[in-house]
């Protein structure tokens, strides 16, 4: 998989860098693993905006991804590597020995025809899922559970991974993609390897229209709003008149907003800002 740059034939492609999709092996998704995806425009069930600057975009269908990897001991063959519009990573279509089909995140190096397995007896090989207690130190992981049986929550974006640093009692020490060191129970499952499509971070949309295609609207600065719409709005000229704040008056640009004394604090050995 690589990136494609364009000659400046038009203003829209002058700076555009996009994926060439050369690693995909199938164009149409598996129909049995699709569910409808209704757009919300950033609104909740009360109709109130909970995420600003969302709306429009191309219609999508959601691909059901197996984050739990709970078919223990049943081998599966990689049937295809596909595009997923709902995430930055590619997805792999698995066909299990009993005939069931599932999607998983496609790690770097996984190819069509490979066999993957979940369980304590699985080999340390890209695409296999094992409990942390059965994985050697230093291994790069993705799709890591926070609680046993909850399904993978950590390291699911394109090109990211966790590293298993140590094991102490009932907990394993993981280095997160952010650099944070965190304890996770050793019974939690994780998948071997780094999430594929690592060139995603180097893509450049090149024009505002491509941002609208994915459902993002222009992000308006508070300083150019009216006083009724933002604490920093109004005034003569471009003066802020105060420290930068969010639309709800909370200080921003470096202000720490994480609530203190959370129950999960005991699992964080080193914060990401202490690296």
UniProtKB/Swiss-Prot annotation:
Subunit structure: Part of the 50S ribosomal subunit. Forms a bridge to the 30S subunit in the 70S ribosome.
Gene Ontology BP terms: cytoplasmic translation
Name of this chain's protein: Large ribosomal subunit protein uL2
Role this protein plays: One of the primary rRNA binding proteins. Required for association of the 30S and 50S subunits to form the 70S ribosome, for tRNA binding and peptide bond formation. It has been suggested to have peptidyltransferase activity; this is somewhat controversial. Makes several contacts with the 16S rRNA in the 70S ribosome.
GO cellular component, one term: large ribosomal subunit
Family to which the UniProt record says this protein belongs: Belongs to the universal ribosomal protein uL2 family.
Keyword RNA-binding in record: yes
HAMAP family cross-referenced by the UniProt entry: Ribosomal_uL2_B
Keyword Hydrolase in record: no
Record's keyword terms, sorted: Ribonucleoprotein, Ribosomal protein, RNA-binding, rRNA-binding
Region described as Disordered: spans on this chain: 236-263
InterPro entries associated with the record: NA-bd_OB-fold (IPR012340), Rib_uL2_dom2 (IPR014722), Ribosomal_uL2 (IPR002171), Ribosomal_uL2_bac/org-type (IPR005880), Ribosomal_uL2_C (IPR022669), Ribosomal_uL2_dom3 (IPR014726), Ribosomal_uL2_RNA-bd_dom (IPR022666), Translation_prot_SH3-like_sf (IPR008991)
PANTHER family membership: LARGE RIBOSOMAL SUBUNIT PROTEIN UL2M (PTHR13691:SF5), RIBOSOMAL PROTEIN L2 (PTHR13691)
MF terms in GO: rRNA binding; structural constituent of ribosome; transferase activity
SMART domains: Ribosomal_L2, Ribosomal_L2_C
NCBIfam families: rplB_bact
């Amino acid at each position: 998989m690589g990136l494609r740059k364009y000659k400046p034939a038009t203003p829209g492609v002058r700076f555009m860098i996009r994926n060439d999709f050369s690693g995909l092996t199938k164009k149409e998704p598996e129909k049995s693993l699709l569910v409808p995806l209704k757009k919300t425009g950033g609104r909740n069930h009360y109709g109130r905006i909970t995420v600003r600057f969302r709306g429009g975009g191309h219609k999508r269908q959601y691909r059901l991804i197996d984050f739990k990897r709970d078919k223990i001991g049943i081998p599966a063959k990689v049937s295809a590597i596909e595009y997923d519009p709902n995430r930055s990573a590619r997805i792999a279509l698995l066909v299990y020995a009993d005939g069931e089909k599932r999607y998983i995140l496609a790690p770097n190096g996984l190819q069509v025809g490979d066999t993957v397995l979940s369980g304590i007896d699985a080999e340390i090989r890209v695409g296999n899922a094992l409990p942390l207690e059965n994985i050697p130190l230093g291994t790069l992981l993705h799709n890591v559970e926070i609680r046993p049986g909850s399904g993978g929550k950590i390291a699911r974006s394109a090109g990211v991974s966790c590293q298993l640093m140590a094991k102490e009692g009932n907990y394993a020490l993981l280095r997160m993609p952010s650099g944070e060191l965190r304890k996770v129970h050793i019974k939690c499952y994780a998948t071997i390897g780094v999430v594929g499509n690592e060139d995603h971070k180097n893509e450049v949309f090149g024009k505002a229209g491509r941002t609208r295609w994915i459902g993002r609207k222009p992000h308006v600065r508070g300083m150019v709003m009216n006083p009724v719409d933002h604490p920093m709005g109004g005034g003569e000229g471009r003066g802020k008149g105060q420290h930068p704040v969010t639309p709800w008056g909370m200080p921003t640009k470096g202000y720490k907003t994480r609530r203190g004394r959370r129950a999960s604090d005991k699992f964080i050995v080193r914060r990401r800002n202490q690296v």
